[in-house]
């Protein structure tokens, strides 16, 4: 795996964990070079404990949390694009002129193309069209990725950004509704608050269908690193977070498998693999 290169394109610090953290850690441990692009510093995120950050310092704190997670998972380099967190859909943060969703798509595309051509990844990971749960920034990075990948491969596009590079494969990490339901059931069995899961019906309607998952990975060997990465993001995953309600042994069982849908090239048939790099000439 020493010559393999994997690039994650995401919106916020902590996007690198839930659907893919164990996979990133496992590939990194076996020699794959893993890099991450984060378009914002999560300025509009929560602050679980006021002792950890203020609204004014949150971006700086979350950058350090991201770097902690990167060290934990084996990510060799993180690029922050510096756009502002757009916040949840319908909030005032959406209107900020510096918000990522208000950025110039052509500018973002060019910046991503430059990174792709420099790093020359064999696999790119990014959000599916709904962005997991409809976050505007998640949807934006999905759209910008699908624009940047063919642009990076086009030798006529912006020669000043480096030599053209055709990315062999793009995947969407998928957080299955079934995984969240399992977590809910285990929390209910312990008499814990499960109100967080009330919006699952919306995920069922807009989320990624199970029959279009192409790679299933058992991350039992690196699920501890994944859970440790959650703890790096202390401002987002405080004691009240649903990801800290179950004992670690149970959470390790719930999150043991990670799922990926192949976006580029579109697979001709449904097929379940175990390796994102399968059959890619390296």
Regions found by a protein language model. Name each.
Residues 1-7, 93-94, 98, 102-282:
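Metal-dependent de-N-acetylase/amidase catalytic core
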